[in-house]
Every structure is written in structure tokens, then in C-alpha cells.
């Protein structure tokens, strides 16, 4: 393959994730994006039980029952001249670690905001994570077919709460039952909305020019006058779009629309392929790797069990950073130092897998894994280096796991260790007893673990409260002092799934006191994989 062909393949890749608060419409927007990418023919809307058309990207049993996306799916589709990789992140209240780690594998994010509610808690948290890497953000103000807050007010809220400048690209005309469409500030065109066309791609009527009398006829004189008035204000008070500020993560272009009505999604996609960066360079512990390099490198950011219920398999999701993946390629797994031949990597359309012959930087490929691959693993063509910045977060919630049948202790431990390698939950084994404590960043994770232990490992377990409120990974360069610390705090020490030592504190007060007492011991809130 010639260098120019390789460069062309790299330059057309766009890899992004969607971040939002639960119920802001993330799964619906994912569906509509796939519809525009011709990846699906009609969009199934996410509803509670009873509706048979399940959304394409929600595929684990529990997700189908609850109408929420629990695991991160990966979908690739063509749009315009680009190939887009969309990483779907769980939108539900408390899915987190998976989501945080997924954000380390993308070059850009789409923030979906419910325009009736504005900035919500979950969005704030996710934005903090994107800030760690200054990821560029596009914004979609959703649900304009309902009654929303004043758009100017919502933009102000985004700017003040998320500390990012907003540059409106389109502007809404009316909302709720009076929603008529949007005006594009940079193309000087109005796109008119028709109701009831949400499941397919609709032909949109376009009115050129803001002073066109046709506009008054189409949306009514009152709304047309209101639009012109609002635009005067918008042009005076808001930021203009600047590509450099967007790429630095300082400014977000804002699009208005309704994902359910399939309106405005294509404007956002046009912005994404035009402005979002092609695959970006990444740091390793020795140097920076750019997408232009011909030698293959990649890192694993997620492990998912049982995408295929018929086989008890696990799939490791790897982001390609540089080079071209080819079938039966020999790669070095840096952590173990072993060379492995990867003959059957997968590409995804949530849950439907197909084997791939090649992949380029920005693409996500799936590797079959029988427990040998861990989150954070780096694969290269022989170079010894490790990609950095794939964090493990200290859990905020803890439960003790107990068996209904005490004879199944071995299966329980195996199940929990596998689930912890996958990042579904973190496991802590106290040094002084045989308890198994699981830590999570959100309550729903405990239900998921119990459900999966039952379906995948045939283990009936229940969880109960435990006197732990937080955990920190501990280390100390002074061996003697560390031994003393371990001896005196044995009751509060545990090993995690990767056998790293952690201090599990009953209260924050206890943690702070212990910290003061042992200044030479470092207490880490995150741990690199």
C-alpha cells in the first residue's frame, strides 16, 4: 500500500462518542446517526418493555428489559467522504468507569442536551473527563419538538457551568407544537421541519435568505419576525465559530433539532466530518505516537464479556493509534512481552460482528480474549512502550457479595475477577478475612454484576452493605515504613483484582487521619491500567 493511500485512509477517519445525561436522547440520536450513515434502514426507538423494535445499539438482556444502554457498543458507518466510528457510551445514571475509559479512545465528543432541562449533573461529570485531554466537543440541543427553555438561556448555562464558549451554527424557529425548523447562520438558509417523519430520512424544504418573503409564508409572519429579532441578538452576543478554539476544546459549535423527529441530526454530522480532527497523536511512557507512522500500535480500553451468548467469550476493544492492521498479523503484547498472531479481529455494528481484513488509525477492532488481555494493554510491532492515560477510578460505592450456595466460592471468585478485568466492577479481597467486597461508581453496576454472575457463571449471589466508604491505592518508596504501615493497618487493607494493594476506609475522616499519620505513603484516587 502506497504512503499516499495510507494517508488518505487515515484522513477520512473520525472517531467520536456521545455524552449526555440519561434521557437526553442519546440512544435515539445514535439511531438517527446510523440511519444517515445507511447502517440501518429504519430506526427502532428505545422504550420500556413491550415494544419489539429494540434500538440497535442496546443489546445485552438487561438493557433490552430496562430500555437503557449499559455497555459501550462500537459502530462504524460511512458519511459523506468520511468513515465514522461511533462509540456508544452508557447513558444511564450510574454507568461510569466504562464511559470514562471510552472517552480516552475518541478524538471528539458530541454532547447531547435536553433543551427543556439544560445542563444536568451527568453531563458535568463527563465533561470533566473530556477536559483531561481537551477533547473537542460538538453540542446538539435536543427535543425541540417539545416545549423548551429559552435557547439563549440554555447557551449561557452551558458557558457558565461547563466553562466552554458556545458558537450557534443553527438557530431554532419556535418550539413544541410550534416548532417550524432551524436557520443556518453560516449558510443563510432555513430548513423546515415536518412532523411524523422520524423513522426515515426526510426531504427537507429549504428557504434561502433570511429576508426571503417565502420564509414568512412558510413559518408565519410572527415567528419569522421573532427569528430575525433573535438572530440580531445572537450575532451580537454569542461567539463566532473558530476552528482552532474548537480543536483546543475551548469552544463548541451548537446545533438545534429533534432526534426523535430526525431533524437537525444531519447538520451536526456535516459539522462533525468537516471540523472534527482525523486520528490524533497519543502519548506513551517513552514518546508520542502519530497516526502517520506505518508501524502498528494500539491500546485496549474496554473488555466486554459475552457479546455472543452461545460462546462464553470475551472481546477486548482496541483503538488503533498508528499503522494498518492486516489479518494474521503478528503483534507484541507489551505487558506480557509475548508475540501473538491476531487472525480474527472483529469490526462491530452493535452485537452483529463481522471479521475484518484491515483497520486503520481511529478504528476500533475487537480481539478474542480468553483472559489474557487486560484493560490498558498496549500492542505494537515489537516496540516496548505503553500508552498512558487509561485510568481506573476509585469506586464510590461498596457492597459485600455473599453466596447462596457456599460451595460455589471458586466460580464466584472466577466470575468476579473476570468482571473486574472487564471493568464492570472492582473487586477487593481484604487481607484479614475471606470477604469479597465489590466497588462500583454507580448503584446499577451491582445489579448488573449479580445478574451476570447468574446468567454467565451460574452463581446465585446477593449483595449486602459493608462498612467501607472509599478506597485508595497505596504505595511507598520506603520499604521499612511501608511494612510498618501494613502491619498497623492490616484490617483496612485489601488486594484488588490485579493484586494491587488498596486501603479501604470506613469513612472519609478515617482516610484523612490515616493520610496525616503516614505522610510517606501515597494514596492514589486513580490508577493507570
Curated annotation (Swiss-Prot):
Q: What residues does GTP bind to?
A: 20-27, 88-92, 142-145
Keyword Protein biosynthesis present in the record's keywords: the answer is yes
One GO cellular-component annotation of the UniProt record comes to: cytosol
- Keyword presence, Protein biosynthesis: yes
Places the protein is found = Cytoplasm
Q: What GO biological process, any one, is recorded here?
A: regulation of translational termination
Sorted keywords for this record are: Cytoplasm, GTP-binding, Nucleotide-binding, Protein biosynthesis
Q: Which Pfam families match?
A: EF-G_D2 (PF22042), GTP_EFTU (PF00009), RF3_C (PF16658)
Q: For this UniProt entry, what is the primary localization, expressed as one broad class?
A: cytoplasm
One function term, GO molecular function aspect:
guanosine tetraphosphate binding
Q: State the superkingdom.
A: Bacteria
* Record-annotated membrane-spanning stretches: none
Domain tr-type G, which positions?
A: 11-280
Q: Per the similarity annotation, which family is this?
A: Belongs to the TRAFAC class translation factor GTPase superfamily. Classic translation factor GTPase family. PrfC subfamily.
- What does it do? Increases the formation of ribosomal termination complexes and stimulates activities of RF-1 and RF-2. It binds guanine nucleotides and has strong preference for UGA stop codons. It may interact directly with the ribosome. The stimulation of RF-1 and RF-2 is significantly reduced by GTP and GDP, but not by GMP.
What is the protein name stated in its UniProt record?
Peptide chain release factor 3
Q: Which gene encodes it?
A: prfC
